[in-house]
Structure formats: C-alpha cells, structure tokens
Amino acid sequence: MASTALLALCSTGAFSGLAVEAGAGVCHATPIYAGHSWHQATFRLNVAGSTLSRYLRDLLVAANPDLLQQALPRKAITHLKKRSCYVSLDFEGDLRDPARHHPASFSVGNGCCVCLSSERFRCPEPIFQPGLLGQAEQGLPALAFRALQKMPKTLRTRLADTVVLAGGSTLFPGFAERLDKELEAQCRRHGYAALRPHLVAKHGRGMAVWTGGSMVASLHSFQRRWITRAMYQECGSRLLYDVFN
C-alpha cells in the first residue's frame, strides 16, 4: 500500500508538490513534501466520476422524459460522459446563452439516440460547485487552495510550483484550465497573490497513480522499505502508517 497522491506525483518525476486527484469515487487535494503526505492538510470532496455519471442520467431524463422508460446502462452513461462532456470556463454565462451550448447527438445503445445541449457542461460542474447537488462542501479549487494554505509558509511556494492533476475525472476538456483559473483566483481573494500555482496536467494522468506506482516499485531505495508478509503478521496494519506516513 502507498499514498495515491504520492504515486500521482511520482508519475511526473516529482517528490514534492500538491496532488489534486479526481477519480471515480472521490476527489482529494493532498500536499506532498519530500515524499511524505501531509494528512492534516489533506482535503476530500465526495463528488467524483460516479456521482457525475448519475447526475448526467438525471439531466438527460429531465430533458427527455421519454428516456425514463428506456434502459440506460450505467456503462453507456459513463461512456457518453467521457465522449461528450466538458468543463465550462464561464458556467453562468454559458448557461444563460443557448448559442454557447454546442448541442450534439450521441448513441447510447439499444437503438437509442440522445441529444445533449447544456448537459454537456453541466455534468462536470458539481466538482467545482457541489451545491448543484445539494452538498455544502467546497469545490475542488477551494480545497486545493486550503491544502496549500494549511502548509507551513516556507513550503507553500515550492508545493504550488508543482500542482499535479491525476485521475480520470480530470480528463474533461477544460478541466485543467478551469482549475488553474479558480485556484489563482482563490489565492488572490485570500491575500496570497504572490502564490502562483503551476499545474502539471499530463496526457496520461488518468493512469497517473498506476504509472507512479510502477516507477516507485523499480527504485532500489523503495525496495529496501518493502513490508514482508511476516512483518505485517507480526505488527499488523500499524506498520503501514509507520512506513508510509
């Protein structure tokens, strides 16, 4: 076992920075310094890929009531989300102006074809505005800022220089640009204008944790820290925290 945030950072060749993960089940903003996670400065958002897939289905049914009678497999909805959805850089403006909706038709199988309009950019928006789902949590950019803010002043700039995106839900077109824009706005709004976060958004970031894990496992320095089955049976799960924290 290892910190997914650390492995995401390692996939870029870094051992210090801020990992911003958005996967299927949850989002995290985790500061990493010298290979160690700062759990007290880690923030979690319970809105991620699976939540967005359910939200997209609700949006589709609301716009096309006839779909309620259709069997819409979860896999088909997830595929539709990945193919068609994107993050708006001006959500309120796009929502008000139908000319900016970019409607498109997509097949969801079983001979069923749906037309998406504003749903294309409304689907990922709860990661930035959880209130759209009735949740009181802050959006991911605010959590990323809080993670940096909670770190010692002497480390903030170094961590902000490497803000690594990881996870399949960061692959929406416009995601990196929106996060960058809002994270900078958070810094200015709270009096940290000198803090200039630099996002690292690699093309393979959907598999960043796996890639980082394969890289770390090949390091001789890491192999010396492997936990054997006998060690685990003797010490139990406490040993994981002693080794990896």
From Swiss-Prot:
InterPro entries cross-referenced by the UniProt entry: Actin, ATPase_NBD
SMART domains: ACTIN
A GO CC term assigned to this protein in UniProt: actin cytoskeleton
Record's protein name: Actin-like protein 10
PANTHER family: ACTIN
Gene3D superfamilies the record matches: 3.30.420.40, Actin, Chain A, domain 4 (3.90.640.10)
Species assigned in the record: Homo sapiens (Human)
Protein encoded by which gene: ACTL10
Disulfide bond sites: none
Pfam families: Actin
Family of this protein: Belongs to the actin family.
